[in-house]
């Protein structure tokens, strides 16, 4: 489907297979390439019913990230941060202004792709902060 001839297979588990992975990639992948290696990788996507999101999200043990992608770089950043604010409101109990203020003070922006027709930005923040504010 792209320059690596990725093969997609679908089953009842809805998995997709990719023959290449990035060993590393600089922010933006500015010349269009990363260090890639052949691999057989299978991942599974879970569908959460009645939980709408506008843009992709990533969640790890130490951070959360919302991803925005569009032609203007600053708009991609706005999309990522807007989605992150919605996420903080819905899942972490933040008020909109408080989430916006905290991201202004603690948030990070990652440039994922700068060479395709659309730029990809990730807005992220440390989950440690939320655990301090909203202990379980």
Language-model features, listed with the residues they occupy:
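Glycine-rich anion/phosphate-binding loop at the beta-strand->alpha-helix junction
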Residues: 1-49, 82, 89, 96-97, ...
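A hydrophobic, small-residue-rich beta->alpha segment in the mid-to-C-terminal subdomain
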Residues: 49-102
């Amino acid at each position: 489907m792209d320059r690596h001839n990725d093969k997609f297979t679908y089953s009842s588990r809805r998995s997709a297979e990719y023959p290449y992975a990035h060993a590393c990639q600089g922010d933006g992948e500015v010349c269009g390439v990363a260090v890639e290696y052949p691999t057989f990788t299978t991942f599974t996507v879970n569908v959460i019913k009645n939980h709408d999101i506008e843009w992709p999200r990533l969640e790890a043990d130490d951070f959360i990230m919302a991803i925005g992608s569009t032609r203007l770089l600053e708009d991609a950043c706005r999309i990522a941060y807007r989605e992150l604010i919605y996420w903080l409101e819905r899942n972490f109990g933040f008020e909109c202004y408080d989430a916006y203020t905290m991201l202004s003070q603690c948030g990070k922006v990652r440039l994922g792709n700068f060479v395709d027709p659309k730029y990809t930005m990730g807005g992220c923040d440390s989950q440690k902060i939320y655990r301090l504010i909203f202990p379980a």
